[in-house]
Amino acid sequence: MYFSRNDLIQKEIAGLAPYAISSTNNGGRFYEEEEHSYRLPFQRDRDRVLHSSAFKRLQYKTQVFIFSVGENYRNRMTHTLEVAGLSRTIASALGLNSHLSESIALAHDLGHTPFGHAGQEILSSLMKDHGGFEHNKQSLRIVTSIEKKYPNFPGLNLCRETLKGLMKHGTEYDPSMMLLERKESGPSLEGMIADLSDEIAYTSHDIEDGWEMGYLHLGDLSENPFWKEVYEECKEQYKDVGEKILVRTAIRTLTNSMVSDLIQNISLQLETNQVKSTEDLIRLWKQGIRIASFSERVDSKFRELKFFLYEKLYRHEDLVRMSDYGKKVIESLFDYFLKHPEKIPDTYKERIEEESLYRVISDYVAGMTDRYAEKIYQSLH
């Protein structure tokens, strides 16, 4: 016995809420393909992202701490996998399409540069007069054109609903009108959940990594009311455990509290606003009503916690020094390839006439891992 494609579709529909995005409502693909016998469209999207070259490179790209400082801290891939896990959990609990949320989550950081946000900042500056650079747009470029794995189309040919979920910011994107569609209808709930899962994941794991690195101390953390509340509860419940276990338990509890609040508040908003279909979600979006959000109480605490991390962790002198180093490497490589375009790999070089030298260099450098960028940089100095 096995489930046919039709069986799988019926099984999916039976488990989805009426306002979820089903496989039969995926928006189609830019290039027509024969449907798979045993995998639904968003499952195929997930697998295509997982097998992409850009995804493999994420394991050697900085999340917060430059890869060379240690291997026990999050990199861009481990962060992405954590976001995907949270997205699946939240989507499933709300009767949404977990395959769609997971696909969006797995693809959301494909466009990130080496050296984390420092890399994006310097590339954005270098490209400001040449079309700009922004990692969400770069993720779209990767899945729609840069990846070369299939004989019948460029990119990964993902479903339009998956692509819409990657459009986190209101920026122009050619050649499609997908962004206009998102502006008119808003993102799916599945897409909004992937966005919020990203925020939960990086906030929680940055606390853990910052504490492990010695940049955050319990005294510092206790200055934040949200952390202090959770930590004191854990301390009261687990009186005989050591500090390391207690801190990690508090981080898990913090994550769980945000996830639970998000699920409960979205459920409340769906009920309060009598959401019965995706059309209802579109109507509410146009009215400025956002269904996917934390409760006011947790949202306020979460904002304070993120500001606390900005002040106490992200602006730490060691991280600033790491960021400055990353910017120096990328700026040096960019300048080198501008002067020596013949050194650009053929797979990129062949696009220069079509897309400009600046854009091709931006694509090439943005796609590098930290250690590959460092290797080239060191060979030039």
Swiss-Prot record:
<dbReference type="InterPro" id="IPR023023">
    <property type="entry name" value="dNTPase_2"/>
</dbReference>
<protein>
    <recommendedName>
        <fullName>Deoxyguanosinetriphosphate triphosphohydrolase-like protein</fullName>
    </recommendedName>
</protein>
<dbReference type="InterPro" id="IPR051094">
    <property type="entry name" value="Diverse_Catalytic_Enzymes"/>
</dbReference>
<dbReference type="Pfam" id="PF13286">
    <property type="entry name" value="HD_assoc"/>
</dbReference>
<dbReference type="GO" id="GO:0016793">
    <property type="term" value="F:triphosphoric monoester hydrolase activity"/>
</dbReference>
<comment type="similarity">
    <text>Belongs to the dGTPase family. Type 2 subfamily.</text>
</comment>
<feature type="domain" description="HD">
    <location>
        <begin position="76"/>
        <end position="203"/>
    </location>
</feature>
<keyword id="KW-0378">Hydrolase</keyword>
<dbReference type="InterPro" id="IPR006674">
    <property type="entry name" value="HD_domain"/>
</dbReference>
<dbReference type="InterPro" id="IPR026875">
    <property type="entry name" value="PHydrolase_assoc_dom"/>
</dbReference>
<dbReference type="InterPro" id="IPR006261">
    <property type="entry name" value="dGTPase"/>
</dbReference>
<dbReference type="Pfam" id="PF01966">
    <property type="entry name" value="HD"/>
</dbReference>
<dbReference type="InterPro" id="IPR003607">
    <property type="entry name" value="HD/PDEase_dom"/>
</dbReference>
